[in-house]
Amino acid sequence: TNIHTAVLQKGRPVEEISQLTPQMLKDGSWEGKSFRKYNIGLPPPRITPGRKHPYKEFLDNVKYKFVAMGFEEMRGGLVENEFWNMDALYMPQFHPARDIHDVYYVKEPASSKEIEEPFRTRVSDAHYSGGDTGSRGWKYHFDIEKAKRLMLRSQGTAVSARTLAGNPKIPGKYFSIARCFRYEQVDATHAQDFFQIEGIVLGDDINFRTLLGLLELFALEIAKAKEIEFLPAYFPFTEPSVELHVKHPKLGWMELGGAGIFRPEVTIPL
């Protein structure tokens, strides 16, 4: 019937082209073709791109700031021996100061290779009698087997110790964003796995005032702090030592970091 014929004619499939290509323009094959109409009302396919973790983005920004201030990046392994993590920093093997760092020890292998000379002898002498540092030392016999015990790095200063022993440039400025591990009770301000920002400045014409100025710059540029204050502190490997505190608009005063001038017992043996 006429109705059936009309329905069949209307439903007959028509070839449509969805995309006009350069080749079609070149050979003229587009002429006489039917092109699919665009429906601008259709929603586009949803794209779910990957994004940086906010904390990773913050660490990248910190790295950028340090490089912009003329610092060179230091690197080190996640697994370290007690010698570079503590002994080289004049932390005695028996002292309560060492208990600050409740660490994770490596089960296998439990110990590192022999400690490199002359650092082994120099650090051992500094602990026993002060060596060439002018100090009286800690007056105990250094246990080299304890110094070789492997552990997960508990502080970023271990990276600085290895840098000092590696003939760094003087004057020079170095930094690291070191992943550290401690056997902590996890709470709002403590974690067992964290990143520690570390920096050292080497030179003949720098002093404690230079350090305070750099800490203030750090607080302003990286923490965007409006109010800062310095408080006296104690660290086994620096003297004098200082804590940097900043005022958070909601949390109030909080510690941003600790710093100090490396003791001769640290710098001279290295």
Label each PLM-derived region with a short phrase.
Residues 4-270:
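TRNA-recognition modules of translation machinery and tRNA-sensing kinases, especially anticodon-binding
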